[in-house]
Amino acid sequence: MLSPKRTRFRKQHRGRMKGVSSRGNHICFGRYALQALEPAWITSRQIEAGRRAMTRYARRGGKIWVRVFPDKPITVRPAETRMGSGKGSPEYWVSVIKPGRILHEMGGVPETVARAAMEIAACKMPIRTQFISAK
């Protein structure tokens, strides 16, 4: 699972996901990509599940790039705990995704293979996505 080696602060505010992605919204490395259409938090487990699904389908063919990294810690309070006594402890990591963001890229495979692999990866994501190709 992906997570930062170290961070300046252990806990973060939740923040808001408004607007569209201004960075990371163009294909840079591969020829085909999976683009987010909705805002969401995507966990490191979901990113890894998508990457594995694509790798398994492509079967050593082509190359896959993961364009998102989970750098936001999400805290969870223990079950049956009274209110107060501070914020919970960091439980897992998420990546803040805005519409337009490229999640995965793929190259070195035919479009049919890339499209099918990304469809499987899209099923692992909690948001609607679209398949795009470089001009």
From Swiss-Prot:
Q: Does the keyword NAD apply?
A: no
Q: Which Pfam families match?
A: Ribosomal_L16
Q: GO MF terms on file?
A: rRNA binding; structural constituent of ribosome
Name residues in a coiled coil.
none
Q: What is its main location?
A: plastid
Instruction: Show the segment(s) annotated as Disordered.
Output: 1-21
Which residue intervals are annotated with compositional bias (Basic residues) in the record? 1-17
Q: Does the keyword Plastid apply?
A: yes
Concerning PROSITE patterns, the annotation shows: RIBOSOMAL_L16_1, RIBOSOMAL_L16_2
**What is one GO cellular-component annotation here?**
chloroplast
Which InterPro entries does this UniProt record tie to the protein?
Ribosomal_uL16, Ribosomal_uL16_bact-type, Ribosomal_uL16_CS, Ribosomal_uL16_dom, Ribosomal_uL16_sf
Q: Which Gene3D superfamilies match?
A: Ribosomal protein L10e/L16
Q: Where is the protein localized?
A: Plastid, Chloroplast
Instruction: Give the UniProt keywords, A-Z.
Output: Chloroplast, Plastid, Ribonucleoprotein, Ribosomal protein
One GO BP on record is: mitochondrial translation
Sequence similarity: Belongs to the universal ribosomal protein uL16 family.
Question: What do we know about how this protein assembles, alone or with others?
Answer: Part of the 50S ribosomal subunit.
Name of the protein in its database record: Large ribosomal subunit protein uL16c
Q: Which species is this UniProt entry from?
A: Amborella trichopoda
